[in-house]
Amino acid sequence: MAGVWKVLVVLVGLAVVACAIPHRRLRYEEVVAQALQFYNEGQQGQPLFRLLEATPPPSLNSKSRIPLNFRIKETVCIFTLDRQPGNCAFREGGEERICRGAFVRRRRVRALTLRCDRDQRRQPEFPRVTRPAGPTA
């Protein structure tokens, strides 16, 4: 019976210590890297995207919710399970996207919301062709 009590005390002690240890804060760069990896996994058969710049929030007070804001650009590599975008060159004239979202961590649950839209300011402009409205001779 004494052995059972010792095991129970050890288990309770371990549970208290596990609850008392704070979650390690993820660095903003780590969260952005995870978000980009998640985004690229949805690009099967499409070009991978690589990080151009990340804009961390002015202050990161929350351990549980991290707002995301970063830009990515298309690379010359196509998605495969083992390909890392960091090893791929940017595609000349490649599409750029602005990504916004949030990373939320509550106890053992992690959630990522992410939306990456084309950066309209960075798209190449094509010359406009004007034609006369009337019939041509």
Curated annotation (Swiss-Prot):
This protein's record includes keyword Lyase: no
SUPFAM superfamilies documented for this protein: Cystatin/monellin (SSF54403)
Disulfide bonds: 77-88, 99-116
Main location: secreted
GO molecular function: cysteine-type endopeptidase inhibitor activity
Keywords recorded for this protein, A-Z: Antibiotic, Antimicrobial, Disulfide bond, Secreted, Signal
Subcellular location: Secreted
Annotated signal peptide: 1-20
Entry superkingdom: Eukaryota
One BP term from GO: defense response to bacterium
GO CC terms of this entry: extracellular space
Entries under Pfam families matching the protein: Cathelicidins (PF00666)
Spans through the membrane: none
InterPro entries to which the protein is assigned, alphabetical: Cathelicidin-like (IPR001894), Cathelicidin_CS (IPR018216), Cystatin_sf (IPR046350)
Tissue-wise expression: Large granules of neutrophils.
Annotated family: Belongs to the cathelicidin family.
Function: Binds to bacterial lipopolysaccharides (LPS), potentiates weakly the early antibacterial effects of BPI. Inhibits the late lethal action of BPI.
Protein name: 15 kDa protein B
Species assigned in the record: Oryctolagus cuniculus
